[in-house]
Amino acid sequence: MHSVLQKNVERKMSSTEKKETNILLALLAYEIFDQAMNIDASTVDWSAVLAEAQCHKVTALMYPAIRSMDGVPEAVFNKVCGTAIAVATASEAMLKEQRRILDLLEAHQIPCAVLKGTSVAYLYPHPELRTIGDIDILVDEENLDEACKALQADGFAPSYTAEKHLCLQKGAVWVEMHRMVSVFPESEKGRFTKQTMADALHHIQTAEIDSVRFPMLSGAYQIIALLAHMEQHLATSGIGLRQVCDWVVTVDALRDCFDGETLALLERCGLLQFAKIMTRLCEKYLGLPPCSWTADASDALVDAMLSDVLEGGNFQAQYAKRPLADVLTDAYDVAGKGKTSLFRNYIRYLKKYLRQNEPWAKSRLWLPVFGVFLPVRWGVRVLLGKRKQINLVHAVGTAREREKLLREMKLYQ
């Protein structure tokens, strides 16, 4: 498989070697690690750099580097500066709203922890420049209903329900109230990770941004939560540079936590290979000081992962590039078959879809019903112009190629 993967890497390397991509990575490394830059601003295709940064939602993180450079076109500086101001303003508002929600939960004596979001943003040199998303809060399963009722009494309305969380909305604020950190596959190591993370709320620390405090997971639990979040998205459409930046600041801040005990735990969870590849990527391309435990990470896999990240972009940009990825890709190979099977992948997707969206349909008899209904509904939406037409041959080829890379991560294996 390594030989096939190497061919894929070689075919994709042009995207990783593009001058504009390397410049974007250098700008991010300057912000995160104050790494020296050697960039002649007059030779840069700034429109390409900005387009790439916007795709990954990291434009605001370019601001400190752009501000320090000579020769950057005024229009480019103004674009980056304007984005930085907008992101910082939104971050401040979200931070205050998050604190207000945490106060509501505290008033109801509901233990909780912030996932992602500010729990990684506070580690950035300039936390306000990290583009915000939803507010993700973890509570125990038995407290989920009460937590959601508290938010509904405050004006939030239920939006949708997923297997791991309930989403509520009030205006422009979206809150994902998690009953679990992530959804784990039904493998031995997947079940072990689920059991381990069920105890996460007993491992809490307090962090702060601009004197605004919030609870978050500590040590190995924060590490596993971030890895699980990344692999969930990687296993379908992919992750972008924003998620890689979150990982690099976390690894650097928790460097001392990656001791023998934590590495052994990651191995038991089936996440050590993934952690090694992502960390080595950060060392190679974002200026992370070397970690001794990544020495045996494959450079071919690291380069392939960067190519995958760059091609994917942030979550909002991925569907057009990787349509039906959730249906066509099986990253875990829980069945241990080794070979990919579109039929098996589709059955796996149907089970997941029914579990998350139609919990009442518990009988296996519903599988063939929805197996026909979902494609028909999708076809009707395409005809009505509500969905873009998809080249299924290309989608299948892309999914199979990515699946080879994902299997090399040995997720939960």
Language-model segments: which ranges?
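Conserved NTP-donor binding/palm subdomain of two-metal-ion nucleotidyltransferases/polymerases, i.e.
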Residues: 2-133, 139-413
